[in-house]
Amino acid sequence: MVVRLPYVKGSILCSALAKGCGHNYYGEPAWPNDILYIFPVVILGTISFSLGLGVIENQAIGEPANPFATPLEILPEWYFFPTFNLLRILPDKLVGVLSLASVPVILVLTAFIENINRYQNPFRRPVASLVYLTSTCYALWLGYGSVLGISEALPFV
């Protein structure tokens, strides 16, 4: 059922529709069609997909936990690997804490570098892109070194 007929004599509407632009103001309304019929189908599909993945999942993944045995080396979660390795390889604790405090400072300075240039294209902001790529590669290298031994974890050595 069409709710409202379009006014096709207007040149702006015809030119916008010819280019594939414009909004779909005409046709079926969202209430009750989408909300009563499409949303429950999507919600039930998502729930059944999640339950299906839960049913076919392997039960035994890794070793069972033993609360009375301490592992040889305790590793943090994966997103703390670069900072863990940075604290581990620096000889002085004050230098390690200052280096960790410098990470948010570098992030804030990168945001200011991005605001100096008015362009949104990353290829037209080479300084900010270079800072971002360099720090990302160094963080990935630090994260990889955290799972190695201390003699192999030293970057740039």
UniProtKB/Swiss-Prot annotation:
It is a multi-pass membrane protein. The chain crosses the membrane at residues 35-55, 94-114, 130-150. GO terms for biological process: photosynthetic electron transport chain. CDD domains: cytochrome_b_C. GO terms for molecular function: electron transporter, transferring electrons within cytochrome b6/f complex of photosystem II activity; electron transporter, transferring electrons within the cyclic electron transport pathway of photosynthesis activity; oxidoreductase activity. Pfam families: Cytochrom_B_C (PF00032). PANTHER family: CYTOCHROME B. The 4 large subunits of the cytochrome b6-f complex are cytochrome b6, subunit IV (17 kDa polypeptide, petD), cytochrome f and the Rieske protein, while the 4 small subunits are petG, petL, petM and petN. The complex functions as a dimer. Belongs to the cytochrome b family. PetD subfamily. Component of the cytochrome b6-f complex, which mediates electron transfer between photosystem II (PSII) and photosystem I (PSI), cyclic electron flow around PSI, and state transitions. NCBIfam families: cytb6_f_IV. This is Cytochrome b6-f complex subunit 4. It comes from Amphidinium carterae.
